[in-house]
Amino acid sequence: MDLTTAEQIESEIQRLLQAKRPVLVAIDGRCAAGKTTLAEELRELCGCGVVHMDHFFLQPHQRTEERLNTPGGNVDRERALQEVLLPLSRGEAVSYRPYDCKLQALKEAVHVAPGAVTVIEGAYACHPSLREYYDLKVFLTVEREEQLRRIRRRNGPEAAIQFRERWIPLEEQYIAACGVSDCCDLRFETHDGK
């Protein structure tokens, strides 16, 4: 991730902080575009809290055919709203149990202290049912070849097949159907390991 990207976003956050607190920032975008990396850079730059949408994937009993056929339906956005966005928007502390995809279970609670800025990062962060709660929405994109290269490096070649055949098509359906890039205030293309 190019540090100037994080610096541009941090500058916009500082502008928003002049008008209101707390400021909630969403970072959405394509798989392997650098959403988590950018969130961590913002944590270092401005000391913000970070919540990962990966912690809100559906539990097995929630994965109905109807739900999974809905754009953005494979994330528990209702729980993300109730347990994270609503409390943070009121300046309250957050406590939620992240879902672990490998264990297929909820883990021990994660606590996020209320702060001036919190970043919610991950695919589906800008779902239409959530986007009104953000003060700043950022979209990251990456070219397909680079995306697949990053996924192979991060998750291994076998997992990359599942990403290519299952997760990327679901994300692309969500991005197109929900107008995710268009709803965002800032858009960045990442490349060459940035």
Annotate each language-model stretch with its function.
Residues A32:
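Walker A (P-loop) phosphate-binding loop of P-loop NTPases
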Residues C46-H61:
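Short beta-strand-centered segment that lines the nucleotide-binding/catalytic pocket of NTP-utilizing
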Residues A105, A109, H127, P157-K194:
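Small-molecule kinase domains that catalyze NTP-dependent phosphoryl transfer to phosphate-bearing small molecules
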Residues K35:
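Conserved lysine of the Walker
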Residues G49, Q62-A105, V117:
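Conserved nucleotide-sensing/catalytic segment adjacent to the nucleotide-binding pocket
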